């Protein structure tokens, strides 16, 4: 933020019926239920002027659309960090790369974590193979 960069959070957001959804049936762990402490952006991360976009699944089509339309006139560079490398981060990175193939996309591996160390490494390798720059690996 102090460099003048825009900060946008995506927040996994589910309802009380999560376990009855297609995702919930395949990943039967209630998490990020709207309004709970686990749903909120962690203390110390939210900064003034940051945007928070709720997303019902792994990748954010809404954010991709915003970046493609509202930011289309800007020289766009995207840096991703977050949890989980092997679910949400990789999904957003690939979604953004497909939507904006010329935009430089970077993932800071030191600011990410996967479900397991192995799945974290696999996700980083997948992103590298798709021409997404991975730093601090």
Protein language model features and the residues they cover:
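Active-site-adjacent betaalpha module
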Residues: 2-6, 15, 21-137
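Active-site loop/turn elements of alpha/beta-hydrolase fold enzymes
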Residues: 12
């Amino acid at each position: 933020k102090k460099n003048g960069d825009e900060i946008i959070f995506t927040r996994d957001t589910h309802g009380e019926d999560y376990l009855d959804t297609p995702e919930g049936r395949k990943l039967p762990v209630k998490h990020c239920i709207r309004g709970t402490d686990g749903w909120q952006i962690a203390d110390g991360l939210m900064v003034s002027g940051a945007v928070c976009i709720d997303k019902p699944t792994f990748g954010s089509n809404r954010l991709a659309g915003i970046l493609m339309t509202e930011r289309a006139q800007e020289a766009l560079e995207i840096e991703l960090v977050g949890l989980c490398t092997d679910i949400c981060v990789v999904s957003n990175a690939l979604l953004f790369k497909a939507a904006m193939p010329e935009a430089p996309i970077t993932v800071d591996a030191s600011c990410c974590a996967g479900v397991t160390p192995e799945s974290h490494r696999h996700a980083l390798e997948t992103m590298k193979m798709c021409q997404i720059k991975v730093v601090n690996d």
